Amino acid sequence: MSSIDITEKHPSINIFKLNNAYYFKHFFDDPELFNELEPYYEKANYRFKMTNAGARNKVMKLLDMKGFDPNLIEDAAPYPVEIGKYQNYGELLKNSIESYPLRDKVVLVMKDMVWVKQALEMGAMLKTH
């Protein structure tokens, strides 16, 4: 009898290259996996940061072995949105990799295209260079 692989793939996780480091955001409900990734966790920003390609490769391999689909994003151009700094953007902030102020707006690099779309529905605009 042939065996069928019924391993369920978890969601894809985008790993962004920004400013010579690699970042991703994901909530893991597997405490064992989180403990393995904990050395890379930036608690203040609720994200994971790898400072070099070797660490990134190690994390991507671990995520893949745990059933996730890690995707390296070297061009983050489609992911930034901007929203007025006085608008309610807390939910967007929780689902962004990076954020910074820009005049009367806040620029957010969203963690995936689902959240880019959500941000646009909440009144954000795509950030153009």
Provide a role label for each language-model segment.
Residues 1-129:
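Accessory DNA-engaging acidic/polar modules
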